[in-house]
Amino acid sequence: MSNNGLDIQDKPPAPPMRNTSTMIGAGSKDAGTLNHGSKPLPPNPEEKKKKDRFYRSILPGDKTNKKKEKERPEISLPSDFEHTIHVGFDAVTGEFTGMPEQWARLLQTSNITKSEQKKNPQAVLDVLEFYNSKKTSNSQKYMSFTDKSAEDYNSSNALNVKAVSETPAVPPVSEDEDDDDDDATPPPVIAPRPEHTKSVYTRSVIEPLPVTPTRDVATSPISPTENNTTPPDALTRNTEKQKKKPKMSDEEILEKLRSIVSVGDPKKKYTRFEKIGQGASGTVYTAMDVATGQEVAIKQMNLQQQPKKELIINEILVMRENKNPNIVNYLDSYLVGDELWVVMEYLAGGSLTDVVTETCMDEGQIAAVCRECLQALEFLHSNQVIHRDIKSDNILLGMDGSVKLTDFGFCAQITPEQSKRSTMVGTPYWMAPEVVTRKAYGPKVDIWSLGIMAIEMIEGEPPYLNENPLRALYLIATNGTPELQNPEKLSAIFRDFLNRCLEMDVEKRGSAKELLQHQFLKIAKPLSSLTPLIAAAKEATKNNH
């Protein structure tokens, strides 16, 4: 009896649980239906040319016309076509002028107050364009790299601000009519958190870093004039297009892939296939390596359904060379018929999202997760890679408490949330203000996102999660460092760590290397302290479904 009593007394207490799950369904945020269609291009000049040739061939006249026609140079179709719209802000009335109807409808339902609009009209336009970008909604995520000589990039949609002295502001907002996927795209908007992350192996992680423009574009904020009798400022946007690179043919891509992937039948090397995710262009399985007994995740992608096949080649090549203990690493790849099989590490503990929404973490556990993530970020940043999607959904946990950033996102088509992307591009709760406002940015956008993720670990959700998506974007762009619900409950060194991560001034924001030396990380508990939380989160998740 005494032994039984001793056993009960020595049993560790259950991890603290959140009273209610803070996970919000992605479908709860309805910002209205977005129309991503664009105006049709002018008639193809080639058609008119063919008709003219036909009429000249049947009508009497000088036959030398044919000879002259052959000598005429071929005139190519219009390229880099832009449709320009004009948006201004009247400081007297507090109204935008010339705003597209679609934007006006979004703004009307955004819960951004009139006083907020008048206080920072430029931020309103920034977030409207960011939210409503048709390219953003269709963009795919792929691994990206920065130039060693330039940490920051100037967005191709940077702002030029000019004063208008006579009429209300009517500056151009460039709206690209060319939907070619190869064009440089603005920073993509991160989709809202789904109701439950079945498997973050179905997510893509690294997003494309837009190409540095050929010339610098001045970026400066606007503010309404203090004197209402003076004309409002002009809000000007310029779009610069990059030169298109020649596309690789499907056969060239297959030939290159054959030279990269392993030879052999993966069905003989791996066994016990179990499906854990299904998407538009592929399926994700767990499997067992016959030789080593290691459990792995295998992405099976139909190459015909991948929009940017050539980028997959670059990802495989780079991932083979970039291995790190804090990253879910690439292991192998195979061509099986029309499918590309990519083998990755598998972590059975699930995502950090389950832990932050179902349990309560203490500072020592939060410090341990932050340290592991910073080690991964220091590695990525030193290799000129910006992650740009740091959030709890993209942190995987092992049952031993190991913490790893998810893999380099081979194909966004695999994610099951694609149905929402056409009508709701989502709110980037973790995204740095400089990305939302399309300013120059570099690796420190990941540090901001890490700070937001630390707030997730404290409060169970990121700031502004329950705001209208457009207003959340506005608050990210204008509010600066988000406020904590109960900052007095945190230690001074934790508050300082958060302030270093969530510094609006990018120059003052800490780098991954600097923050690894922060005093807060010295209180980190062993990674094994996360195991009870992982087990408790798994149990709670099982009971919720």
UniProtKB/Swiss-Prot annotation:
CC annotations in GO: actin filament; axon; cell-cell junction; centrosome; chromosome; cytoplasm; cytosol; dendrite
Annotated GO biological process: actin cytoskeleton organization; apoptotic process; branching morphogenesis of an epithelial tube; cell migration; cellular response to insulin stimulus; cellular response to starvation; cerebellum development; chromatin remodeling
Q: Which Pfam families match?
A: PBD, Pkinase
> Changing residue 423 to E: reported impact?
Constitutive kinase activity
Where is the Protein kinase domain positioned along the sequence?
270-521
Region span, GTPase-binding: 75-105
Q: What is its main location?
A: cytoplasm
**Function of the protein:** Protein kinase involved in intracellular signaling pathways downstream of integrins and receptor-type kinases that plays an important role in cytoskeleton dynamics, in cell adhesion, migration, proliferation, apoptosis, mitosis, and in vesicle-mediated transport processes. Can directly phosphorylate BAD and protects cells against apoptosis. Activated by interaction with CDC42 and RAC1. Functions as a GTPase effector that links the Rho-related GTPases CDC42 and RAC1 to the JNK MAP kinase pathway. Phosphorylates and activates MAP2K1, and thereby mediates activation of downstream MAP kinases.
The name of this protein is Serine/threonine-protein kinase PAK 1
